């Protein structure tokens, strides 16, 4: 079900169901979570029971639950994946986020489908095709700018989803095979080895060192706080936070931050609304600086910049809080700009490495000065230079606040109590129009003190503290002020609120699979390389049905034995180090974009530059021992050698 054009959806990640609940309570309009398998996050799976329990919790708030099934599938996995989709549909989830087009060829229930970021949606033509082929919502590539997003929005009727916060893959999503090439762990199957976070030395075509031992493929984290209004204007409706590996504190904090930002825009502009019900009150001040990040960038949304990389370290350094004055074997003396607390996480940068520790005890020794005893003194701390900058990447007191109840989300209800001496009628109507009416029969006496009785009735029906509701308006319309025992009134109110819970679930509008356009779409290319990630016969049939004539197998099929682009990126190291021909004065021909090399130990990667689309291709080769491994996802790869031997027929006489 496509979002209404004026609705904005804040979409939060959830490693597990507990985090999903907190994301919703902190303001998420939808959450995305991994199921028992095929979820593109190797260590972030959840049982069907956990998801089934999550769904009604979300739906009472009008919030949605999306399940990721966005790995590419081996032929041996098609049947179990199809069974899982059927099971997920029965739990009531709202949509599947998928990468593998083979899913669209399966015999599955009419569940809504969203095109994953792994589909690498960068062009109008591809976006329109996916929309016409049956996808209700599409996740655009993080590398797009506002004009490109706007063009896609105008060309398609799918809901546009865009990442607004979190870790950035340096490669186009779905176009990175370096992990599989080097380790056999496929990013397209949720098991990335994070080669992009390693240190590399950059050399030019003459072998000269341009940068030594830097994290040259490690990006800063995405932060679109300043661009939310512009993204809305460009047509984005679903604002996605990255982070299905992130912990509870991270999800609470970042969800709360963007809930407040979007609510401010909705209130300021008018004509916009959040896509779920309720108001959220936070009991802490959100700060994107206080949970994990590698520095912030808005990437390419406005224009290409040369400071998008986190070259010094892929770790979370945190905020500067002072400087180190003295280091001994047991403690540090520091001067700070903010108070410290026991349990704080502190660090300094020593020779390009982050050296950190937890503060076991801090003692104030003077104005803005502390003595800090670490839990364990890092071995290299004595190397800290005089007045080295001190950073805090874990604010213990702030984290403690997040460990407690840190938000409350309630739905506004209008309450009307009417009736007469023989019957009371209680009506509760939610802010989104869902309404229930409950009656209570009896012989109720007229109260001696009318004013006191009316006030008591108003207070009684307004006590919604143990529910997800709050009373926005209360009307008591009785011919006479009646005396109702508190116990009876409380039970009457509780039963009505429970009826409202049930009505919200009963009236929840479930989406369905979008129909293929008439006439059916034609895929914009007739030849697909291994970069299309076609890994099974159903995906191949899908593309053939829509006009593709030549289809290469996915990289995981081990058919690409030579040098190929194992990573394609919008990030360009020539640009980052002012070696781009387009930066050179005069003609573009005056400075050629010759290949360069990235070196990490024995691993040597070639960089080639495609200047027309401003892309960098990282060229590498699959290691021989990986070529000999079973294809990921195949039964052979999933079964131990001993168990595999048990499946072989026994010889006669043995």
Give the location of each predicted region:
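Surface-exposed amphipathic alpha-helical tracts and adjacent flexible/coil segments at the periphery
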Residues: 1-26, 30-33, 37-40, 54-55, ...
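Short active-site loop/helix that positions an aromatic residue
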Residues: 102-109
């Amino acid at each position: 079900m496509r979002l209404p054009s004026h609705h904005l959806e804040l979409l939060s990640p959830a490693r597990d169901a507990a985090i999903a609940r907190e994301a919703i309570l902190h303001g998420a309009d939808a959450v995305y979570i991994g199921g028992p398998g095929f979820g593109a996050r190797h260590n972030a799976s959840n049982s069907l029971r956990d998801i089934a329990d999550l769904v009604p919790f979300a739906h009472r708030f009008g919030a949605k639950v999306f399940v990721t099934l966005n790995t590419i599938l081996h032929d041996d996995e098609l049947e179990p994946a199809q069974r899982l989709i059927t099971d997920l549909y029965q739990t009531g989830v709202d949509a599947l986020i998928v990468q593998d087009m083979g899913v669209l060829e399966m015999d599955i229930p009419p569940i809504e489908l969203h095109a994953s970021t792994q589909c690498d949606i960068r062009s109008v033509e591809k976006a329109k095709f996916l929309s016409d082929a049956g996808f209700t919502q599409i996740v655009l590539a993080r590398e797009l700018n506002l004009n490109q997003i706007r063009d896609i929005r105008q060309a398609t009727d799918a809901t546009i989803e865009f990442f607004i916060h979190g870790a950035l893959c340096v490669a186009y999503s779905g176009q990175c095979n370096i992990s599989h090439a080097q380790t056999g762990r496929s990013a397209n199957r949720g098991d990335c080895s994070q080669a992009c976070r390693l240190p590399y030395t950059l050399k030019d075509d003459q072998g000269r060192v341009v940068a030594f031992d830097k994290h040259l493929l490690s990006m800063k984290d995405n932060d679109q706080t300043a661009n939310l209004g512009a993204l809305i204007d460009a047509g984005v409706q679903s604002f996605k936070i990255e982070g299905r590996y992130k912990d509870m504190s991270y999800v609470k904090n970042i969800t709360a931050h963007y809930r407040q930002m979007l609510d401010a825009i909705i209130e300021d502009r008018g004509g916009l609304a959040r896509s779920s019900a309720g108001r959220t009150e936070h009991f802490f001040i959100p700060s994107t600086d206080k949970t994990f990040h590698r520095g912030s960038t808005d990437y390419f949304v406005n224009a290409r910049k040369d400071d998008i990389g986190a070259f010094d370290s892929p770790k979370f350094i945190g905020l500067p809080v002072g400087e180190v004055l003295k280091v001994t074997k047991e403690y540090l003396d520091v001067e700070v700009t903010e108070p410290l607390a026991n349990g704080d996480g502190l660090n300094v940068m020593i020779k390009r490495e982050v050296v950190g520790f937890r503060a076991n005890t801090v003692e104030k020794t003077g104005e803005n000065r502390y003595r800090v005893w670490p839990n364990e003194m890092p071995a290299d701390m004595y190397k800290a230079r005089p007045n080295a900058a001190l950073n805090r990447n874990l604010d213990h007191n702030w984290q403690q606040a997040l460990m407690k109840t840190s938000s409350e989300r309630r739905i506004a209800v209008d309450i009307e109590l009417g009736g007469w001496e023989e019957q009371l009628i209680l009506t509760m109507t939610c802010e989104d129009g869902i309404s229930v009416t409950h009656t209570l029969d009896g012989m109720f006496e007229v109260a001696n003190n009318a004013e006191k009785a009316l006030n008591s009735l108003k207070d009684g029906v307004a006590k919604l503290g143990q529910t997800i509701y709050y009373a926005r308006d209360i009307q008591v319309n009785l011919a006479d002020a009646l005396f109702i025992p508190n116990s009876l009134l409380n039970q009457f109110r509780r039963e009505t609120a429970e009826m409202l819970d049930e009505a919200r679930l009963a009236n929840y509008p479930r989406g369905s699979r979008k129909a293929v356009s008439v006439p059916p779409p034609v895929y914009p290319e007739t030849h697909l390389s291994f970069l299309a990630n076609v890994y099974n016969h159903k995906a191949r049939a899908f593309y053939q049905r829509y006009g593709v004539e030549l289809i290469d197998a996915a990289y995981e099929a081990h058919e690409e034995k030579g040098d190929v682009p194992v990573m394609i990126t919008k990030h360009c190291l020539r640009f980052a180090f002012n070696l781009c021909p387009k930066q050179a004065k005069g003609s573009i021909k005056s400075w050629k974009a010759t290949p360069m090399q990235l070196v990490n130990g024995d691993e040597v990667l070639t960089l080639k530059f495609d200047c027309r689309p401003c892309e960098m291709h990282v060229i590498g080769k699959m290691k021989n021992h990986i070529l000999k491994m079973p294809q990921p996802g195949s039964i052979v790869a999933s079964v131990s050698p001993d168990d595999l031997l048990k499946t072989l027929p026994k010889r006669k006489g043995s």
